[in-house]
Amino acid sequence: IDGNEAVAQVVYQINEVIAIYPITPSSPMAEWADAWASEGKPNIWGTVPTVVQMQSEGGVAGAVHGALQTGSLTTTFTASQGLLLMIPNMYKIAGELTPTVFHIAARSLAAQALSIFGDHSDVMATRGTGFAMLCAASVQEAHDFALISTRTTLESRIPFLHFFDGFRTSHEINKIELLTTENLQTFIPNELVIAHRSRAFTPDNSFTRGTGQNPDVYFQGEEGTVIYYIACQASLKSMDEFAQMTGRQYQLFEYHGDSTAERVIVLMGSGCETVHETVDYLNTLGEKVGVIKVRLYHPFDSQRFIAALPPTTRSIAVLDRTKEPGASGEPLYLDVVAALYEAGEQLPKVVGGRYGLSSKEFTPGMVKAVFDNLAATIPKNHFTIGINDDVSHTSLDYDPDFNI
């Protein structure tokens, strides 16, 4: 089973309205949902989800927003420019504290050129919308997080982007442990669904939403959502409940490596798998290295991130699968730097780098080069890995023949 089908199998069964407009590499998720609806396949409540194809991703976002206002459990799948067209509605959905999950096969954006391949450029463009962001690193995680994100959005009322790497994960065929219908029914309590229904616009439950506000109250309204984002981090305790149900334990920030590691790489997405295996190999050679896999990117829980770091950490490399021209650093790097600075403790050296844009290969040799850079007296910051940058000279040298 590939990543797209693994996600679609869960999503179809726990939603009532699925608005679609196909875009590579997320299209198979929409195709699966459409096919199952045509066959009359029911969800866990015994009804056949309504799958509707709109005229564009902008139309999809409007349809999702509207369906959510009726109390329907609603979702969509998209990527890249399609996700960008949804941003205006995403601000409204998040601002109105409306539970939903958008499932994203993360893909490059068309900038200096178009590319259909995977990186995190699209999801990072939505950081200001107010959506929480949960990242899966494998087909199994994508399958599981499709359920965990839905449970958490219903509990917290914070909408979610559940994303995984386009092609590298969305089209990877792997053997996984599938969630059963009983698992889904157990993990989505009826009281959460009823609570979502109770906020629907109906003649019997009339109230005002989406008003125009003036300076006397708008600021207060914006700040009033803070408690929901704090609660959202706590809501992911459902990961522990998921572990009891399936035996698969996930953490918001998962550390893997030597317990006394001095050099640590921080990243999210499919690259975590490569770093994980390379860390194991390097530690057998006597190195003291580790990796932190970021699952919940937004809202970023600084305290849990600090707690996940080994106390022996002396240097950190934060790897982003995106580029933000003109910024002082890439998104994950900036969040990590802020978390460490605000902790007020002895700060390890932190450098940031870019890798894997447009599905550029990310190999064990590249991981070793990043760790070697961290061992330098003055590590290179804002580096690239995986290319030969003979223009701005940001790239790290690596051994293409290194293998594990």
Curated annotation (Swiss-Prot):
Keywords: 4Fe-4S, Electron transport, Iron, Iron-sulfur, Metal-binding, Nitrogen fixation, Oxidoreductase, Repeat, Transport. CDD domains: TPP_PYR_PFOR_IOR-alpha_like (cd07034). One of its GO terms (biological process) is nitrogen fixation. It catalyses: oxidized [flavodoxin] + pyruvate + CoA + 2 H(+) = reduced [flavodoxin] + acetyl-CoA + CO2. InterPro entries: PFOR_II, Pyruvate:ferred/Flavod_OxRd, Pyrv_Fd/Flavodoxin_OxRdtase_N, THDP-binding, Transketo_C/PFOR_II. Its EC number is 1.2.7.-. One of its GO terms (molecular function) is 4 iron, 4 sulfur cluster binding. Pfam families: PFOR_II, POR_N. The keyword Repeat applies. Belongs to the pyruvate:ferredoxin/flavodoxin oxidoreductase family. Oxidoreductase required for the transfer of electrons from pyruvate to flavodoxin, which reduces nitrogenase. This is Pyruvate-flavodoxin oxidoreductase.
